Every structure is written in structure tokens, then in C-alpha cells.
Regions:
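N-terminal first-folded block
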Residues: 4-39
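Short, ordered loop/turn segments at secondary-structure junctions
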Residues: 23, 42-43, 67-70, 88
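Solvent-exposed alpha-helical segments within well-ordered globular domains of core cellular machineries
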Residues: 7, 23, 27-30, 49-53, ...
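Mid-chain, well-packed structural core segment of small domains
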Residues: 54-83
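Conserved catalytic alpha/beta core of Sir2/sirtuin-type deacylases, generalized to analogous enzyme cores
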Residues: 1-3, 15, 103-106
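C-terminal structural segments of small proteins and small subunits
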Residues: 73-110
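N-terminal positively charged helical leader segments and presequences
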Residues: 30, 34-52, 59-61
């Protein structure tokens, strides 16, 4: 678990700039509020495909954290495999050192 990333995620949540869970992430992406989306290493294949589609559709960068859902639970008090940050500063800090996941928009016929 990366304690630096956990700290950033926790601060983001306390600032009210974090969407937790698939439904909230999709809503924030659709509204244009999401600056970046982050997934855990143990997200299901179905959820991974769904979040890739959402990020491709709304042109939001997607990153994979070196964290599990249990690590996320430790930092947030809520078990989640996908989060979105609605603040550019927090998103940039959390994405530092991570490579965005490449998404081919043609894969989804968007």
C-alpha cells in the first residue's frame, strides 16, 4: 500500500472532491466534473471494462493505483474499486508517477 496516495485520497475525500464507487464516478464523468479516475489492482474485469468505456466516452484519464480494495477501505472507510477526483490539484498529485491506461475509443464505437 502506498501511504502517500492513501493520504492524498483521504484529503480529497475530506475536501469533498472525491466520488467513490461506479455510480458516482459515472455521474461525475457525465457531468464533466471528474478530472481523473483511479482504479484498484483487484477490480473485476466487468467493472474495468465499464470504467474504461465511461472514461473513453467522456475523455477522462484513467489510472491504476498500486492499491487493493482493502487498502482503499483503510483510507476511506468504504470498500471501493473505482474513485474519481473532481479537483485538478488532487488528481495531479495522485496521478504523479502513474502512467495513464491507454483507451482506444474505437473499441467502444463511441
Amino acid at each position: 500500500m502506498n501511504s502517500n496516495k492513501t493520504g492524498i485520497i483521504t484529503m480529497c475525500r475530506k475536501a469533498g472532491k472525491l466520488a467513490v464507487g461506479m455510480d458516482m464516478v459515472k455521474k461525475n464523468c457525465a457531468e464533466g466534473k471528474a478530472c481523473a479516475v483511479f482504479i484498484t489492482t483487484d477490480i473485476s474485469e466487468k467493472s474495468f471494462k465499464e470504467v474504461r468505456f465511461t472514461c473513453a466516452k467522456f475523455s477522462v484519464k484513467l489510472y491504476r493505483l498500486d492499491m487493493t480494495m482493502d487498502d482503499m477501505w483503510y483510507g476511506l472507510g468504504k470498500k471501493a474499486g473505482v474513485i474519481a477526483m473532481t479537483d485538478g490539484g488532487f488528481a495531479k498529485s495522485c496521478a504523479k508517477g502513474l502512467e495513464p491506461i491507454e483507451i482506444d475509443p474505437d473499441e467502444f464505437d463511441i
